Amino acid sequence: MKRAVVVFSGGQDSTTCLAQARHQYDEVHCVTFDYGQRHRAEIDVARALALKLGARAHKVLDVTLLNELAVSSLTRDSIPVPDYEPNADGIPNTFVPGRNILFLTLAAIYAYQVKAEAVITGVCETDFSGYPDCRDEFVKALNHAVNLGMAKDIRFETPLMWIDKAETWALADYWGQLDLVREETLTCYNGIKGDGCGHCAACNLRANGLNHYLSNKAAVMAAMKQKTGLR
């Protein structure tokens, strides 16, 4: 039996990954992390979506220690989430230092226990928003370290790594979940489901990707299939 663990936030990217994993694995587990995030509403959204999409199990892990250590606008209400700035340089204040290091490591430990062969994460280098822990180089390095540390071959899969946001919408559509991802996921840094606040970087990226996909469906779908190897 093929098993996988999805690092699951209930947002566009991880929900698309879950939809695909349900077709590619016999048994899919979801792991969601409560780190005291500003957009904590995503946890309830993740619970509902994991159930709706047929996850075998859904764990919500308390990692609020991260909130104490990692200062970010996503972990401190006193730090405002910035509006989208197209020419912003450097690492944004929405970056939570160590988040993906912790999430992927804990997901791998869970995968070890349930005998899963893969941990799936929706990180993406094409639209990585300046986050260093969304890069392919980082994921591969951590995967190597985790496998050495557990003497176990658990594969970190990044199905969105080389596709852009429009192509991520195409992937959701390919698996028949475009409307669900559009209406029921929570990507917004301010914790608003669906189309979100419309001002933060996450909402801007999501909306621009959707608009591009809807206006160029055939071309974007073809590009997504070419990059992912889907037929």
Curated annotation (Swiss-Prot):
Keyword Electron transport: no
The enzyme's E.C. designation: 6.3.4.20
Alphabetic keyword roster: ATP-binding, Ligase, Metal-binding, Nucleotide-binding, Queuosine biosynthesis, Zinc
Biological or metabolic pathway of the protein: Purine metabolism; 7-cyano-7-deazaguanine biosynthesis
EC class name: ligase
Reaction(s) catalysed (UniProt annotation): 7-carboxy-7-deazaguanine + NH4(+) + ATP = 7-cyano-7-deazaguanine + ADP + phosphate + H2O + H(+)
Binding site for Zn(2+): 188, 197, 200, 203
SUPFAM superfamilies the record matches: Adenine nucleotide alpha hydrolases-like
Top-rank taxon: Bacteria
Gene3D superfamilies cross-referenced by the UniProt entry: HUPs
Annotated ATP binding sites: 8-18
Cofactor binding summary note: Binds 1 zinc ion per subunit.
Molecular-function GO terms, alphabetical: ATP binding; ligase activity, forming carbon-nitrogen bonds; zinc ion binding
Cofactor: Zn(2+)
Pfam families cross-referenced by the UniProt entry: QueC (PF06508)
Family: Belongs to the QueC family.
HAMAP family noted in UniProt: QueC (MF_01633)
Name of protein: 7-cyano-7-deazaguanine synthase
